[in-house]
């Protein structure tokens, strides 16, 4: 029984670009969607994750809200009373004006996207789950001295290349690295997502990078939010807006020599101290947790449906 004055829970489908089944478990988008769905449910909503195969299914007609996490695949909203929301979390260059116009609302994981005004996009940055990614996820400095988690994306990713050129020995988890590195440098092709919080929290340093176009448009990587929430030391390539969110706690480098200086010294000297990192972790958990994103999405969806 609903309490008087309380709004009816909305039925949500959160659509990802990932395939269904076990294959989808290896996609970060799947875990992102699961954490968001949990946050929506915790705020009284009905929600489920939908893989790319069900994105345009007739089953979406039974939803109140469909939220599409836009990655590599375009999803065309179905006509009808369902409210369709688009959240551009990666590859913003693929989103065209006609696609954006087909949605009731568009969100972008950047506060600095040059096309936000053109497309009517509302800034909504990436997020983390502080129940999983927390300072208690692992003992500091008990894991990999230098850690990188990510596939090659078909290239020798610059931050890994630069780190190795400095003489550093990063521990690599990801697909495709055998084309660039000797096999002994590769820990595994896949690090299970439920092991990721401990890996970040226990690492000496976590390496982060962005696609160049995403860095230029301020689409900050999800890895930054997850790793920062654990209190990890992080070094990243520069990205527009990174300092606005993470301050000077996340170190950035513009030239290989700068990275060599950061990785070659004592981490205690090269990075802010643990108190500063935990201060950032607390702020990220509060301001950039999935609970905050769910509240914003619910408020926006309800407003659209009232209008």
Question: Predicted regions: what is each one?
Answer:
Residues 264-282:
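Conserved donor-nucleotide binding/catalytic region of nucleotide-linked donor-dependent transferases
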């Amino acid at each position: 029984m609903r309490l008087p004055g309380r709004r009816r829970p909305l039925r949500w489908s959160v659509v990802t670009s990932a395939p269904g089944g076990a294959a989808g478990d290896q996609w970060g988008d799947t875990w992102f969607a699961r954490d968001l769905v949990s946050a929506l449910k915790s705020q009284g909503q009905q929600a489920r994750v939908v893989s790319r195969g069900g994105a345009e299914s007739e089953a979406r007609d039974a939803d109140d809200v469909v939220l599409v996490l836009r990655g590599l695949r375009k999803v065309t909203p179905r006509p009808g009373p369902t409210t369709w929301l688009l959240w551009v979390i990666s590859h913003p260059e693929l989103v065209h004006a006609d696609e954006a116009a087909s949605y009731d609302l568009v969100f972008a994981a950047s506060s600095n996207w040059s096309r936000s005004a053109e497309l009517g996009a509302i800034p909504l940055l990436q997020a983390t789950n502080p129940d999983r990614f927390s300072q208690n996820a692992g003992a500091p400095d008990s894991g990999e001295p230098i850690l990188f988690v990510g596939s090659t994306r078909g290239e020798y990713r610059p931050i890994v290349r630069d780190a190795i050129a400095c003489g550093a020995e990063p521990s690599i988890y990801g697909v495709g690295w055998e084309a660039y590195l000797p096999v002994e440098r590769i820990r595994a092709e896949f690090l299970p997502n439920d092991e990721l919080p401990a890996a970040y929290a226990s690492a000496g340093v976590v390496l982060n990078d962005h696609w160049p176009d995403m860095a230029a448009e301020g689409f900050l990587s999800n890895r930054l939010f997850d790793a920062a929430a654990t209190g990890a030391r992080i070094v990243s390539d520069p990205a527009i807006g990174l300092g606005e969110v993470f301050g000077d706690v996340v170190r950035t480098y513009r030239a290989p020599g700068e990275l060599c200086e950061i990785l070659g010294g004592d981490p205690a000297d090269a990075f802010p101290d643990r108190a500063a990192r935990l201060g950032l972790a607390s702020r990220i958990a509060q301001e950039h947790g999935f609970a905050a994103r769910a509240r914003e999405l619910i408020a926006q969806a309800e407003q659209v449906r009232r209008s």
